[in-house]
C-alpha cells in the first residue's frame, strides 16, 4: 500500500485506490506478524477494491473475494501462465509498458538460446550490452545498459520477428526477440491445460485474468 508514504494516505490526490488486488497464496492475517498489511488491504476493500484470492484454502480474504481460485497446491506457476495466456492473446496487456520497460526487444540467438550481446558482434564489445533489430534501418542496434539508451540515434527496435545477424567471426546467426520466445512459452499453457494442472475451471481462470487486466490500477500481493 503506497498510500502509507503520503501524509493524507488515501485522500491524497497522488494516490489512486487499486480497483483490484490479487492476494496470491498470502494469508496475511496469519503470516504477517503485526497484520499491518492485512489491515491496509481491508481499508482498500472498504473503499471499493475487489479481491482475487489464489489459495487452496478458504482464507479470510478468499471468503470475501470477488474471485477465489482454489488451485491445487504447487501449481501456481501454471496458473500464472494461464493468466498471461489470456492477457496476451486477448491483447489486454499494456503494450506501452512492454515497449518501454521490458527487454522484449532484445534478440536471442537460435543456435545457443542465449541473449545476443555486443561482445558477440564486435571485438572489445561489452557483455553487458544487448542487441535489438532496428526495424527502421533494418540492421542490428546496440542497447547500452549503463547509459540506458541505444548507441545509435532514432532506433526503432522490433518487438517481434526473426532476423539474421553477422557475428564478429564472420558467421551469421538467426535470432528472434525475447518477446516472441516469451509468447511461445505462454502459448504452451492454453486454459484447458492450465485447468487440468491446477484443477481451477477454465472460465474462472479467464474471468479472473480479465478482471485483473482490465482493472486500472491493480496490484498483486504474494
Task: Name each region found by the language model.
Residues 27-28, 57, 74:
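Flexible, active-site-proximal loop/turn residues at the rims of small-molecule/cofactor binding pockets
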Residues 48, 62-63, 67-213:
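Long, well-ordered, tryptophan-enriched scaffold segments
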Residues 25, 55, 222:
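Short beta-strand/turn micro-motifs composed of small residues
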Residues 54-60:
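Short, polar loop motifs at secondary-structure junctions
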Residues 211-222:
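Glycine-rich, aromatic-lined ligand/substrate-binding cores of catalytic
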Residues 30-31, 60-62:
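Short, well-ordered, mixed-charge alpha-helical segments that flank or form enzyme active sites
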Residues 1-42, 47-52, 78, 156-185, ...:
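Extended redox/cofactor-interaction regions of prokaryotic respiratory oxidoreductases
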Residues 21, 51, 68-70, 218:
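Short, well-ordered beta-strand core segments
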Amino acid at each position: 500500500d503506497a498510500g502509507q508514504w503520503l501524509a493524507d494516505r488515501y485522500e491524497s490526490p497522488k494516490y489512486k485506490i487499486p480497483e483490484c488486488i490479487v492476494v496470491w497464496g498470502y494469508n496475511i492475517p496469519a503470516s504477517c506478524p503485526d497484520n499491518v498489511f492485512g489491515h491496509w488491504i481491508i481499508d482498500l476493500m472498504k473503499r471499493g477494491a475487489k479481491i482475487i484470492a489464489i489459495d487452496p484454502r478458504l482464507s479470510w480474504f478468499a471468503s470475501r473475494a470477488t474471485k477465489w481460485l482454489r488451485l491445487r497446491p504447487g501449481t501456481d506457476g501454471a496458473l500464472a501462465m494461464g493468466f498471461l495466456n489470456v492477457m496476451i492473446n486477448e491483447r489486454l496487456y499494456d503494450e506501452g509498458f512492454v515497449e518501454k520497460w521490458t527487454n522484449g526487444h532484445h534478440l536471442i540467438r537460435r543456435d545457443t538460446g542465449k541473449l545476443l550481446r555486443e561482445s558477440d558482434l564486435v571485438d572489445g564489445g561489452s557483455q553487458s550490452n544487448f542487441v535489438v533489430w532496428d526495424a527502421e534501418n533494418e540492421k542490428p542496434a546496440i542497447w547500452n545498459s549503463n547509459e540506458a539508451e541505444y548507441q545509435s540515434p532514432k532506433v526503432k527496435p522490433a518487438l517481434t520477428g526473426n532476423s539474421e545477424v553477422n557475428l564478429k567471426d564472420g558467421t551469421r546467426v538467426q535470432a528472434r526477440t525475447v518477446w516472441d520466445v516469451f509468447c511461445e512459452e505462454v502459448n504452451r499453457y492454453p486454459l484447458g491445460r492450465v485447468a487440468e494442472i491446477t484443477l481451477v475451471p477454465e472460465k474462472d481462470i479467464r474471468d479472473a485474468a480479465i478482471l485483473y487486466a482490465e482493472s486500472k490500477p491493480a496490484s498483486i500481493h504474494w
